[in-house]
Design a protein with these regions (language model features):
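Conserved class I S-adenosyl-L-methionine
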Residues: 138-149
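A short SAM/SAH-binding and catalytic strip from SAM-dependent methyltransferases
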Residues: 108-122, 145
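Conserved alpha-helix/loop element of class I SAM-dependent methyltransferases that forms part
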Residues: 22-42, 57
Length: 149
């Protein structure tokens, strides 16, 4: 974990959830969850979960038969997301987008809310996303502005 990633510990996850989620992230999370639900996936991977705003929206909008795996590089963010919880079971797992700990072709959809622009090697991370997607799978992500790879 880099020093920047370590900075998101202590009170930061709670402050992030309390202030930034309602001001910035909630609306986009709902949009990504709606788009994901429209694809009727069986298995969804969320990368850069943060405090779980997208995870909660996915859990509410996807059928209980859809498996959701929520990952983040920062354990403190995952801990905050777990503490808040979801409306149904979700697998929470620390993971690095540069080296996803999943078998090839294991997810129907990969969702990344405002995380891609922070990947130190975007091409490598997106290669990992492609690797874990099933043939015909979908990647849904958003960024603040343009993205350069």
């Amino acid at each position: 974990m880099s020093s920047n990633d370590k900075a998101f510990s202590g009170s930061i996850p709670k402050v992030y959830e309390t202030f930034l989620v309602p001001l910035i992230f909630e609306e986009y999370a709902q949009d990504l969850a709606r788009r994901t639900a429209g694809l009727a996936p069986r298995r969804v991977l969320e990368i850069a979960t943060s405090t779980g705003v997208v995870t909660r929206a996915l859990a509410a909008q996807l059928p209980a038969t859809t498996e959701i795996v929520a990952t983040d590089l920062n354990p403190a963010m995952i801990e905050q997301a777990q503490a808040i919880g979801t409306s149904r079971p979700v697998t929470w797992q620390p993971a690095d987008a540069m080296q996803l700990p999943f078998p090839d072709a294991s997810f129907d959809v990969v969702v990344i809310q405002f995380g891609v622009m922070f990947f130190p090697d975007k091409a490598k991370a997106l290669g990992e996303v492609r690797r874990v997607l099933r043939p015909g799978g979908t990647v849904l992500f958003n960024v603040w502005d343009r993205i350069e790879v």
